[in-house]
Amino acid sequence: MKLNDSNLFRQQALINGEWLDANNGEAIDVTNPANGDKLGSVPKMGADETRAAIDAANRALPAWRALTAKERATILRNWFNLMMEHQDDLARLMTLEQGKPLAEAKGEISYAASFIEWFAEEGKRIYGDTIPGHQADKRLIVIKQPIGVTAAITPWNFPAAMITRKAGPALAAGCTMVLKPASQTPFSALALAELAIRAGVPAGVFNVVTGSAGAVGNELTSNPLVRKLSFTGSTEIGRQLMEQCAKDIKKVSLELGGNAPFIVFDDADLDKAVEGALASKFRNAGQTCVCANRLYVQDGVYDRFAEKLQQAVSKLHIGDGLDNGVTIGPLIDEKAVAKVEEHIADALEKGARVVCGGKAHERGGNFFQPTILVDVPANAKVSKEETFGPLAPLFRFKDEADVIAQANDTEFGLAAYFYARDLSRVFRVGEALEYGIVGINTGIISNEVAPFGGIKASGLGREGSKYGIEDYLEIKYMCIGL
């Protein structure tokens, strides 16, 4: 693997500041989704190694939380600077193991680093309260303290940003962390860990355990030393983890599945709506939890929008993410391809029509053509299930009440989008949509300064913003008698 800094390519896990193999010597191969080539391997660790990482995090906790917020911020700022200095290497590593175009990968590294920078400063603003006493001889004080050892389980679709969005607030608050990255994309996590060491993060404060999801996850959820778990992934797995954490009453943050509606009203700027649909639907080949999954277009502009979207999609360039000009890379694996094919076949069987794409790409493997379906019926699978691929199904709607009812008819509530010019409509629809995030006249919503998270079956808690650090803090009330 060609990197400017070859030491960023790590094939061992990090526990208590040491790079280690699995106790049993077993390993997991990591492949390039663009061509199937083996990139390397990482240790297939289990419960014993995870327990060792938790113990290390627990031992490191007293000294780390005893530092001042400014001292922790200095170390985190070093980490941010190193991420940006090594942006090209980190992006290349990400494209090789995840598949997204290099330009997108570079953007993700910048996005990931922004959480470290943001929370380095937010850690200095963990304020308490002084409450007017209920009695003359009492003083009431509220302070916030780090929750303790935390665990994070992160997905493959954003292998850097989903880590820093958790590690940033945890470390800034004075907590320590044990991370289990996705087995498809562990090298990004290990490279970040290498930079954390260089930044001055003490041994045991940030640990990365690779290996069996079941064995590692079970230890993270059952070990009483872990006081909080943060997970980004499917709703199905999130439910299981929440049940497991209930035994010890662990604090849980969950960022789960989505089924985002993308609504185009008849007063929308159609060119901007198409631009937003491209960004929301086809970024990362549609493999994002906030990507548009259902496109609702009002009758009066349906045909024009479909034509404009088709023209725009036809200009997308599919290929290996390292090649110049590529805008869509491969899907992560064969299962992802099969899910897209299943949703297309189901919609066609129920009356939808393909106007663009509709089948695997001529490159073969995990590549799939960007696809647009029109006249999609409400009972199609794609209206109820998250596709996680480059499929844009267009549904018709008559009026505001109709589309709000359709958009909210789902168990999910992560992100929604709509395009409209009427100011009254903007407020009515924005408030009526049952989602944690609403993008209005924009298809890009994620950043470090705003709260990210969903409602209903899409999760618990918020990441990013001033609220993101709260999930890593405990509130303590002290009543002082004079």
Curated annotation (Swiss-Prot):
GO cellular component, one term: cytosol
Catalysed reactions listed for this entry: succinate semialdehyde + NADP(+) + H2O = succinate + NADPH + 2 H(+); 5-oxopentanoate + NADP(+) + H2O = glutarate + NADPH + 2 H(+)
Family per record: Belongs to the aldehyde dehydrogenase family.
Gene Ontology BP annotations: cellular detoxification; gamma-aminobutyric acid catabolic process; protein homotetramerization
Pfam families noted in UniProt: Aldedh
MF-aspect GO terms: glutarate-semialdehyde dehydrogenase (NADP+) activity; identical protein binding; NADP binding; succinate-semialdehyde dehydrogenase (NAD+) activity; succinate-semialdehyde dehydrogenase (NADP+) activity; succinate-semialdehyde dehydrogenase [NAD(P)+] activity
Protein's job: Catalyzes the NADP(+)-dependent oxidation of succinate semialdehyde to succinate. Thereby functions in a GABA degradation pathway that allows some E.coli strains to utilize GABA as a nitrogen source for growth. Also catalyzes the conversion of glutarate semialdehyde to glutarate, as part of a L-lysine degradation pathway that proceeds via cadaverine, glutarate and L-2-hydroxyglutarate.
Annotated organism of origin: Escherichia coli (strain K12)
Alphabetized UniProt keyword annotations: NADP, Oxidoreductase
Keyword NADP included in the entry's annotation: yes
Top-level lineage group: Bacteria
Protein name: Succinate-semialdehyde dehydrogenase [NADP(+)] GabD
Keyword tRNA processing among UniProt keywords: no
Induction annotation: Induced by RpoS in response to multiple stress conditions, including shifts to acidic pH, nitrogen limitation or high osmolarity as well as starvation or stationary phase. Induced by gamma-aminobutyrate (GABA).
